Amino acid sequence: MSTSAVTEPVDIVARLQSAGSAEEFFELLGVAYDPKLLNVARLHILRRMGQYLAGEDLEHLPGDEAAARCKAVLERAYADFVASSPLDQRVFKVLKDAVAPKTPKRPAFVPLDALK
């Protein structure tokens, strides 16, 4: 497990936006992670974090509270993939579409009076 202390919460959102890897997200927020799991599900975890953060209003929070909220959201997203696989979670559209019920194609209708 890798972990690091939470950095000073000076504009944590800007620091996360400039992060270049999933590992940087975990290190900036001080969240422990298993490198093997992160190698498999990094994009899925970050996408899920983004989905969870979309419902948060971090702009008006003090820096330390925003950092704590981001940390909690990343821990929640990571926990989703500890408990199940990316295939089970289906975060991305291509995975959702793979199991979506297909609408049956209706045969083309040609009324009899249109035939000559």
From Swiss-Prot:
Any one GO BP annotation for this protein: nitrogen fixation
Keyword Iron: no
Organism domain of life: Bacteria
Keywords, ordered alphabetically: Nitrogen fixation
Pfam families per the UniProt record, alphabetical: NifW
TM segment ranges: none
UniProt keyword Calcium, yes or no: no
Family matches, as InterPro entries: NifW (IPR004893)
NCBIfam families per record: PRK00810.1
Described purpose of this protein according to its UniProt entry: May protect the nitrogenase Fe-Mo protein from oxidative damage.
Family that this chain belongs to: Belongs to the NifW family.
Subunit note: Homotrimer; associates with NifD.
Protein name: Nitrogenase-stabilizing/protective protein NifW
Protein species of origin: Rhodopseudomonas palustris (strain ATCC BAA-98 / CGA009)
Upper classification of the organism: Bacteria, Pseudomonadati, Pseudomonadota, Alphaproteobacteria, Hyphomicrobiales
Gene this chain is encoded by: nifW
